[in-house]
Amino acid sequence: MLSEIEILLQKFSDNSLFQEYYFVGGTALAYYLNHRISYDIDFVKPERLNTPKLKELSILFQARYIPDPNASVFRINTGESLEEYKMSFNFDGIKVEFFYPNDPLKTAIVKRDREESRRIYPNIHILPLQTIAELKLLAFFERSKIRDLFDIYVLLEKEIIDTELIERYAALKREMLTFPEVIEAFCDDGSESLDFMPENLYYREFYDIPSEAREGYIKEKLTELFVKRAAQGRK
């Protein structure tokens, strides 16, 4: 993890509010795997957010609230406040998102595995690697971010997830497409970059690959790996 993120997590560790949340997302994955740079922090809670407490936290840390552009549409469509599901802040230049999954499956996964969480700082608990991987896989099917694509490749390569789980969630989220077809249709939305530091495990592999060529490279590698593993699983 970036040293700035470690410092911020240490600051958070003095606040008991974080006992209600679990560290997940790309940075939590990088904590386990050291596979790439991740620039933000995600905390999940398997119940609706306590927005007044989060606002108090932001004031305490002099953090800047990041409004969600979809908040008005969400309220019109659901009659609810998006802040009960997701709130984002800028803490010392680092984006920190607190969220309650608006998805029964994700909520069930967090509730299923939260007793297996591990304390990495006082009041800061990280969910198991397998749980974070499962949540990442679901996120991959819902958006088009190159970091997610890369993460799925790493998780499959390291056998943290398998083709059976991928196929199950592909059928759930992309009913009409096989996973190789999902990969082929993938197009990065350009909102994030895929970056590495020399100490990251995949730094050497990607060092000579230009940023604009990395998506195609990962898609090819992931497709080959998935097809190979799926064939092995059917034997």
Can you say where each PLM-predicted feature lies in the sequence?
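Compositionally biased terminal segments of proteins
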Residues: 1-235
